[in-house]
Amino acid sequence: MLRTNNPALREDVFRKPETWDSFQAAQRGGAVAVGPAARPGVMTLQGAVNASFILLGLCAATAIAGWMFIQNNTAMVLPVTFGGAIAGMVLALIISFRPRTAPFLAPVYAIGEGAFVAGISMVYATYAQGTNLGGATGTGIIFQAALLTFGILGALLLAYTTRLIKPSENFKLGVAAATGGIFFVFIAQLVLNLVFGITIPYIWSSGPIGIAFAGFVVVIAALNLVLDFDFIEQGAENELPRHMEWYAAFGLLVTLVWLYVSIL
C-alpha cells in the first residue's frame, strides 16, 4: 500500500512531508516551510480532514433524521436498526477489500451508519425509560454518549497533535491485538446466541466483571482513534493515492460509531 520507490531516484525526496504540525500552522495562518506543493492525485492531510467532516456530517444528519422518523413510526425501529447495520457491514467489507471504491461508497456507508445509530439509540433510550432511571434519562443518555464520543475524539486528537501520545509499533500491535480479541468475543457471542441460545457469562452482566469489560472495550475503541490519526498522517507523508483520503475517513467513522455504541 505504501510507496516502495527508491528514494534516491525521486526528484522530491527532500520535500518536507505534510504532518499534523504543518497542518495546524497552516490553519492558524502561520508560515510553514514546505517544498513544492503535493503532486496531484495523491493523499493530503487536508483532503482526509475534509472527507472526514463530510462523512461525519452525513452520518449525523441521517441519525437525526432517522431519530425523528422513528419517533413518529415506532414500529420501524428494528427495520431501521438492522437495515442500517446490514447495509453498513456489507459496504464496510467492500470498501475494506476495494479501497478504490471509498470515494463512492463511503458516503453511502455514512448514511447507513446514521440509520443504525438512530435505531440503536432509540433502543437504548426506550430501555432506559422502562427502568427506574426515569423517562427523561432515555434521551439524556443519548446526548451524553454523543458528547463523550466527541469529547474523547477531541482530547485524543489534541494529545496526538501535541505528541503526548506517540503510537509506537508496540502500541499499534497491542491495540490491534486487543481489537481482534474483542471482535472474536463478539463473534463468539453471536454464534452461541444463534445456535445454542446462550450468552457468555459475566461479561454481559451489570456486575463488576461486566462493567470492567465494557470499560475495556471503550478504552480500546478510543485508542483505535490514535491509529486512525497515525494512518492519516502516514498516508499523507507517503503520498498514497487520492482515494485513500476517503478510505482513511471511512476508517475514522467506523471507529467513532464503535466508540459511541460502546459508551451507550
Language model region names:
Residues 1-264:
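A hydrophobic alpha-helical transmembrane-helix feature that marks the membrane cores
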